[in-house]
Regions:
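Fungal secretory targeting signals
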Residues: 1-22, 568
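Short intrinsically disordered, low-complexity segments
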Residues: 11-17, 499-503, 548, 560, ...
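C-terminal GPI-anchoring signal of eukaryotic secretory precursors
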Residues: 521-568
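Histidine-/acidic-rich catalytic cores in large beta-rich domains
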Residues: 19-538
Length: 568
């Protein structure tokens, strides 16, 4: 949770009392209020694909202050912030680590959903997998009477899934400075599961292989848990990511040991450590990292001894910061900013070198969460965790896109665990939504289809009699989540629309929309109506990312300043 001074609290009460900035985005789907990206570096030379995010409020709502996003959950967005799919209420409770993957030859989505304990950085629940129609096809839980944690689910070879578990257990912790009554420690566990059956194929327990001597944060003063009870167990290791190589070995990121470990996939022994108190490698300039997240192999050791040059390349997100979530100790910083990193290790020379670093445009340093995804073309998508921002970099480290995950007043306090870019084809099972709204000058029809990626044109028809006869009204190119067609000078009492793909085929039709009077939003404090943006014509949307006015312009500047400096 972010630090709040009395001045910030007083100001936030003023700024956040009105959460209506999330409203009025879609006439056909007024129930949806997705975050509006605040884009400070518009996309240029980014790689193909959509953005996959699951932002949530890092600050609690109070009677006088409400925080963004108003609808926390998984989202698929375009680079301009336009909504593709809202997973709000489809993934219920609290959802994170939202991604696309392949399972048994099928394109799928998955996300953790369950309980979120922000103070301890843990969560307990299950992994839910959706198909291309956004229907649930699998829920996956941990085996051996354990609970899945929120941090990791990673699909391997389209068949198995890697998960991570926090298991509090009682131990004698006095050798590490504990009082006799401080008896609880977290046993950090990984499992590999058969996704189809849930069968446990491999399990590894940190206390069987890693001594608490490797902990960076001691049990006292309790910054990583005090150990007095199972809910406050000492989290000495804190696994937050797992990967697997072609030889069956595992790569784990242990945040509270500031180290990445390679684990033998047969007996669980540690093959090497990168970083921490007992590194197997001498760290070159810029390699040093701490409190990291999201370690992934980019290239692996060969299983052919003749071809093996001893080199392996990994990516990770270097937080270089740890917060005070347990209300004990102080915030720890090991570098001026967080960063994404590509690191090469050489098991023959015992050296590690920095291949490339990716540093934040706004000097961001996230005390929790974060991810680094190296994209197929060499770009890197770095998510800044508790700072609620995402950046895409060219391979040389030049930022080509940067955005915060909500705008105006609602941008304050937004966080996001991981962010990704994936190609995706969405074919929703639900029918498209349509509304027909009348004003003094005529009728406007609005249509949208949550999750659809294939519609290129919308065709609109008037239903002219009780038998369902249809009269063509016109068509509009689909340029965003919602498309509109203006019918000037007359009422359209009943209307339908058809989604048409790039080959001219009809994908799906809507139900019948009966005409309603158009209600326009009242601008804050002005007592006047403001026009709704003509979404189908691609006109600028008032209050959209980078286009805030008046009070919101001031608040956006204030928030940006706070993000950059930490000072008011």
């Amino acid at each position: 949770m972010k630090y709040q001074s009395p001045t910030i609290l007083a100001t936030s009460a003023l700024l956040f009392a009105n959460s209506a900035t999330a409203d009025w985005q879609f006439r056909s789907r007024p129930d949806l209020a997705p975050p509006r990206l605040n884009i400070t570096i518009p996309a240029s030379a980014v790689e193909p694909g959509y953005l996959f995010l699951a932002p949530f409020a890092g600050l609690p709502d109070t009677p006088t202050a409400q925080h963004g996003p108003r609808q926390a959950g998984p989202y698929i967005l375009r680079d301009d912030g336009d909504l593709v799919w809202s997973g709000y209420a489809i993934y219920s409770i609290w959802a994170t680590n939202f991604q696309a993957a392949r399972w048994r030859g099928r394109d799928v989505l998955f996300s953790f959903e369950g309980d979120h304990n922000a103070g301890y950085g843990h969560g307990h629940g299950h992994v839910t997998i959706l198909d291309q129609h956004y229907e649930t096809i699998r829920e996956l839980r941990a085996g051996n009477h354990k609970l899945v944690d929120k941090h990791e689910f990673h699909v391997v070879n389209e068949e198995t899934g890697l998960i991570q578990i926090y298991q509090p257990v009682p131990r004698d912790l006095t050798p590490w400075g504990a009082e006799p009554e401080q008896q609880w420690i977290v046993n950090a566990i990984i499992q590999e599961l058969d996704i189809a059956t849930g069968k446990v194929l491999f399990e590894w327990l940190s206390l069987d292989h890693v001594s608490p001597d490797e902990a960076i944060l001691p049990i006292n003063p309790g910054q990583a848990g005090s150990g007095y009870n199972s809910s406050d167990a000492w989290d000495y290791f804190h696994i937050n990511s797992v990967d697997k190589d072609d030889q069956g070995n595992y790569l784990i990121s242990a945040r509270d040991a500031c180290a990445v470990h390679k684990i033998n996939g047969t007996d669980g022994s540690i093959l090497w450590r990168l970083g921490g108190t007992n590194s197997s490698f001498t760290l070159g300039d810029g390699v040093d990292f701490c409190f990291q997240h999201h370690a992934r192999w980019l290239s692996q050791a060969s299983d052919d001894d003749d071809d093996d040059d001893g080199q392996e390349v990994i990516s990770l997100y270097d937080n270089s910061a740890h917060g005070t979530e347990h209300d004990s100790g102080g915030e720890v910083h090991t570098a001026p900013t967080s960063s994404g990193k590509i690191i090469r290790v050489d098991t023959r020379t015992g050296k590690a070198e920095l291949v490339q670093g990716f540093y934040p445009p706004d000097g961001l340093r996230s005390k929790s969460q974060g991810s680094t995804q190296i994209l197929p073309g060499g770009n890197a998508l770095v998510n800044w965790g508790s700072e609620g921002a995402v950046t895409e970099f060219a391979a040389d480290g030049t930022p080509v896109f940067h955005a915060y995950m909500d705008s105006g007043a609602l941008g304050f306090g937004v966080e996001n665990y991981r962010a990704f870019r994936f190609n995706w084809t969405g074919l929703p099972s639900e029918e498209p939504a349509i509304v027909s709204l009348e004003d003094a000058g005529g009728t406007t029809l609005y249509v949208s289809w949550n999750g659809d990626t294939e519609t290129k044109t919308w065709r609109f028809h008037e239903v002219s009699d009780k038998h369902g006869s249809r009269e063509f009204l016109g068509e509009a190119k689909r340029r965003s989540f919602e498309t509109s067609l203006r019918v000037p000078g007359r009422r359209v009492n009943k209307a339908v629309a058809e989604a048409v793909d790039e080959r001219g085929g009809v994908l799906r039709g809507t139900g019948i929309a009966r005409i309603e009077p158009e209600i326009l939003p009242i601008s804050a404090g002005k007592g006047r109506q403001v026009p709704h943006p003509k979404v189908s014509e691609g006109e600028p949307v008032e209050g959209a990312p980078g286009k805030v006015k008046g009070l919101w312009e001031w608040s956006a500047i204030w928030i940006a300043g706070w993000r950059k400096t930490g000072d008011l």
